[in-house]
């Protein structure tokens, strides 16, 4: 293992399984254990799992916890009032740019959990601390590096989790999307994910991670690496922070307007003024390449309405063609024919709505 990189509680387990390890946001993480293609298909057709312990869980507690979060993020946590209920939101800077995207869980009015990206965790914690201090919010922000997180995804994922941990089934069987069961011993079983498939993201003590991983392997859940995670999230139309949006990109430039709540006019969250006064929306849509080739990030897109740019791209294992996300002129419509600059050649592509894949099946685009 690399001494200069951070490691999750499952690092030695990955190495023992023959994983190819890479640097991801300062963490040594598995890229793949064998065939990335087979790992991708396992999630679409059966069940696969990912070590996502590099992401940071942080608890936000105190009398002002709810007010603090209503100011900190663009979505409105006030609509969460059932323990375990969650929402997805962006945390914005005063210019409306995205500092990070995160999931927020409600435990009680004075107790919340946020899950932030690995590469932005230190920046996020520093930003939250500054916001809390500047606003005199009575909150305590506690990073929980004592916890691990495993995402089990696929049509058979939940059944295999219950086979490995039968005691979790009664509390988690009836969960709807974006809802978690809060279990004893610092365990959270959430019906969330980053693949477009059903499944759970499980937060548990770091000391319990290896045993759960091994028990899931025994149930036939396939370990998957970051390579498959990226192709799965692209097919599912899910953004990657640092690639599809960053601090210079507003939510309405990344297909994330739905994560911004403007209903309460008195809730002046950070970045709201910029969104209301200086919004520069654009179309954020999918592209499917019409010929051979592979789209990647930062490729020019030529449309009748003007130029655009890809933000993420890959070869889709499910569709068998290259797919991409692109920021395009606002009046470009799904179904439009465009061209993508691939190594100096303009290759035709079709504009389509996201996602490309839903519940393991290709979404039909006219």
Curated annotation (Swiss-Prot):
Pfam families per UniProt: GCV_T (PF01571), GCV_T_C (PF08669)
Gene3D superfamilies assigned to the protein according to its UniProt record, in alphabetical order: Aminomethyltransferase beta-barrel domains, Aminomethyltransferase fragment, Probable tRNA modification gtpase trme, domain 1
Superkingdom per UniProt: Bacteria
GO molecular function, one term: transaminase activity
EC number: 2.1.2.10
Key words, A-Z: Aminotransferase, Transferase
GO biological process: glycine decarboxylation via glycine cleavage system
Keyword Transferase: yes
Entry's Gene Ontology cellular component terms: cytosol; glycine cleavage complex
Chemical reaction(s) catalysed: N(6)-[(R)-S(8)-aminomethyldihydrolipoyl]-L-lysyl-[protein] + (6S)-5,6,7,8-tetrahydrofolate = N(6)-[(R)-dihydrolipoyl]-L-lysyl-[protein] + (6R)-5,10-methylene-5,6,7,8-tetrahydrofolate + NH4(+)
InterPro entries membership: GCS_T, GCS_T_bac, GCST_C, GCV_T_N, GcvT/YgfZ/DmdA, GcvT/YgfZ_C, TrmE/GcvT_dom1
Enzyme superclass (EC): transferase
Main function: The glycine cleavage system catalyzes the degradation of glycine.
HAMAP family attached to this UniProt entry: GcvT (MF_00259)
Family: Belongs to the GcvT family.
Quaternary structure annotation from Swiss-Prot or TrEMBL: The glycine cleavage system is composed of four proteins: P, T, L and H.
Protein name in the entry: Aminomethyltransferase
Species of the source: Bordetella avium (strain 197N)
Gene name of the encoded protein: gcvT
């Amino acid at each position: 293992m690399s001494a200069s990189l951070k490691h999750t509680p499952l690092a030695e387990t990955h190495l023992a399984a023959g994983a190819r390890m890479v640097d991801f946001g300062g963490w040594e993480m598995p890229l793949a254990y064998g065939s990335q293609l087979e790992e991708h298909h396992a999630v679409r057709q059966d069940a696969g799992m990912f070590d996502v312990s590099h992401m940071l869980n942080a608890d936000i507690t105190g009398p002002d916890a709810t007010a603090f979060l209503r100011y900190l993020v663009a979505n409105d946590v006030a609509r969460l009032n059932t323990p375990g209920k969650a929402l997805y939101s962006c945390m914005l800077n005063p210019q409306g740019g995205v500092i990070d995207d995160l999931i927020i869980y409600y435990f009680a009015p004075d107790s919340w959990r946020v899950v932030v990206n690995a590469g932005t965790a230190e920046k996020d914690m520093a930003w939250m601390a500054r916001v809390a201090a500047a606003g005199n919010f009575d909150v305590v922000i506690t990073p929980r590096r004592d916890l691990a997180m495993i995402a089990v995804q696929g049509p058979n994922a939940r059944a295999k989790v219950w086979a490995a941990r039968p005691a979790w089934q009664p509390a988690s069987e009836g969960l709807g999307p974006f809802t978690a069961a809060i279990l004893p011993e610092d365990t959270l079983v959430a019906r969330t994910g980053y693949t477009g498939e059903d499944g759970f993201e499980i937060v548990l003590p770091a000391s319990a991670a290896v045993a759960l991983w091994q028990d899931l392997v025994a149930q036939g859940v396939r370990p998957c690496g970051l390579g498959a995670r990226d192709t799965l999230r692209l097919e599912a139309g899910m953004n990657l922070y640092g690639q599809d949006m960053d601090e210079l990109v507003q939510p309405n430039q990344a297909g994330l307007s739905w994560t911004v709540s403007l209903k309460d006019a008195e809730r002046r969250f950070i970045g709201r003024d910029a969104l209301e006064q200086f919004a520069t929306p654009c179309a954020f849509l999918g592209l499917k390449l019409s010929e051979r080739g592979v789209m990647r990030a930062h490729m020019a897109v030529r449309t009748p309405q003007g130029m655009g740019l890809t933000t993420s791209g890959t070869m889709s294992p499910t569709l068998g063609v290259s797919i991409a996300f692109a920021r395009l002129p606002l009046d470009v419509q799904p179904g439009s024919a465009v061209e993508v600059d691939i190594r100096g050649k303009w290759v035709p592509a079709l504009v389509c709505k996201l996602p490309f894949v839903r519940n393991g099946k290709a979404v039909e685009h006219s």
